[in-house]
């Protein structure tokens, strides 16, 4: 786990008010900012900090962006949609979800209807 700290008291005066990221898994300290001696991004062993007192500094990470995820749930049988293609007059109220919107199946073009059927009913995930 990584923790941010600002050193408020230390045996080594060069550490006073410096800001560090402590990685407890690697036992490493990464300097974020220091007045002297230490440089930004310098990595040292946590034990090299010696005796110190500190206050926690909140660390904010950017959200992970995984890309769009979308699920349309239509509770229908394949045969129902295929019959609606062949006999649209029997299904004037048949409504489905497409890209988050409710749409009447009969208002779609034949190409869109085939696409909905192909994407809705698959053999495996």
From Swiss-Prot:
Coiled coil: none annotated. The keyword Thylakoid does not apply. PROSITE patterns: GLY_RADICAL_1 (PS00850), GLY_RADICAL_2 (PS51149). One of its GO terms (molecular function) is formate C-acetyltransferase activity. Keywords: Organic radical. The modification Glycine radical is found at residue 100. Residues 5-125 form the Glycine radical domain. Acts as a radical domain for damaged PFL and possibly other radical proteins. This is Autonomous glycyl radical cofactor. It comes from Vibrio campbellii (strain ATCC BAA-1116).
């Amino acid at each position: 786990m990584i923790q941010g700290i600002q050193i408020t008291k230390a045996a080594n005066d060069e550490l006073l008010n410096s800001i560090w990221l402590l990685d407890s898994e690697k036992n490493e300290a990464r300097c974020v900012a220091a007045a002297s001696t230490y440089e930004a991004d310098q990595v040292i062993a946590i034990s090299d900090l010696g005796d110190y007192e500190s206050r926690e500094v909140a660390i904010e990470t950017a959200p992970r962006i995984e890309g769009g995820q979308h699920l349309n749930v239509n509770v229908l049988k394949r045969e129902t949609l295929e019959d609606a293609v062949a006999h649209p007059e029997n299904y004037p109220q048949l409504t489905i979800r497409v890209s988050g919107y409710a749409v009447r199946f009969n208002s779609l073009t034949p190409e869109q209807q085939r696409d909905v059927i192909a994407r809705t009913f698959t053999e495996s995930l």
